[in-house]
Amino acid sequence: MATIHELHKKLVNKEISAVELTNAVIAHKAKVEPTVHAYLSDSHDRALATAKLVDEAIAKGDAISPLAGIPGAIKDNICIKDEPATCASKMLENFVPPYNASVIERLQDNHYISLGKLNMDEFAMGGSTENSALAKTSNPWNADCVPGGSSGGSAAAVSSGSAIWALGSDTGGSIRQPASFCGVVGLKPTYGNVSRYGLIAFASSLDQIGPVTRDVTDAALVLNAISGHDAKDSTSIPGARVDYTTALVNDVKNLKIGVPKEFFGEGLNSEVRKAIEEAIETYKKLGAEIVEVSLPNSKYALSAYYIIALAEASSNLARYDGVSYGMRVPADNLVDMSTKTRTEGFGPEVQRRILLGTYVLSAGYYDAYYLKALKVRRLIKNEFDEAFSKVDLILTPTAPNTSYKFGEKANDPLAMYLEDICTVPANLAGIPGISIPAGMSSSNLPIGMQLLGPAMGEETLLRAAFTFEQARPDCQLVPPTGEVSL
């Protein structure tokens, strides 16, 4: 399995050049993309130009960063100067940002290579990537199934091998759930640990950029590159940068892992339940202490999340009016122009969420819905704080089900929203979460396990995930077409 850390060694030892590696991944991408369709745009020329610079640095004997020369890809709601940032929407189909997101600046400092921008649910609103207005991305394990969402392109690209790593964004599970569906690692950092400057907003108090990778070590390496305080983001957490690779220790002895009974109730797929119970047994054998915890207010998390997220989306997406940038539909007057632009530019799910968000913020409903949801959010955060005073981590399924067929939930928004039931609490509480592969279903679809930690507890999270990965190599999953020939 091609990983960042293994390929870095090959580059440093001159077993392969950065140009050869980049060309190999581009060639592999050409084979899998006709089926997977993870990408919305390509940047091969820029990638090869950077690869040449990396090779020149190696030839001179210069030290290179772990990400230097390793081909990755970026979710299409993260701004890269002079490259499209469509958010998979007709509204921004022709938008090209004049600046880089802060995470891109940091990746450039590491001589990263991006092969292009990745598909997603429109404006990150969805859990299957079916809401993209520009492409249909398939799950690399079964082309008839969804890759999850909203970072479906990111998870599908890494799983299929058309990128060694990727960036996604997570508002209510949009990194972790597709990682679970595609059998890869997806990390949502603590809110504020990674700058949101240059991330096109869905819900600003919930959004967080994070890595999608093939193993836990790679997740730590990408997090090293993108995390840390950024003066351009007012919600960025101050403090010294952390080397997360120091946390990759194969040891969970005496670690207290909480298992919340509320996440194992009705609606949990029996095969998912079995895989997670086996994961719990693995941790017991490794010396961790398993503790039952209770998060009773988590049953309100999904309702509170959708009220808060849609209210913020309604506000954030008000800027797309056909005046400043993005799509513009001609009309006789300003009001008609704005109305037609928004009607034709936004897809059905985005329109639904704007409508609901505007409703909960309207006079007479603000107190009944939005204010109440904010109070529930505080209760959920307090519950997590209390739980983490007793345990080091919390273990749950990432999603209640494995991937499903295209169209299966497209006409039932509530059924799709319920796929986020295990992931949204972490966003409401602002805590870090990671999804790692925990097995396969009888229909040969990946199952993900989620670990949650206290705010800025990524190191413990990564240690526990790494230890599980080392103990269960059977859970490191690569689809039949996912291996790159080097």
Regions found by a protein language model. Name each.
Residues M1-K52, K285-G287, L477-L486:
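An N-terminal boundary/leader segment
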Residues H8-K9, F263, S298, R319-L428, ...:
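Serine-dependent amide/ester hydrolase catalytic core
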Residues V54-I70, L248-P260:
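Immediate post-signal peptide segment of exported/extracytoplasmic ligand-binding proteins
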Residues L67-I209, P260-E262, A311, T396-L414:
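Short glycine/serine-rich loop/turn segments
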Residues V25, A47, N100, A219, ...:
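Residue-level signal for inorganic ion chemistry
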Residues K31, D109, S160-W165, T171-E266, ...:
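Structural helix-boundary/capping segments
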Residues L21-V25, A304-Y305, V350-T358:
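Short alpha-helical scaffolding segments that buttress acidic/His motifs in well-ordered protein cores
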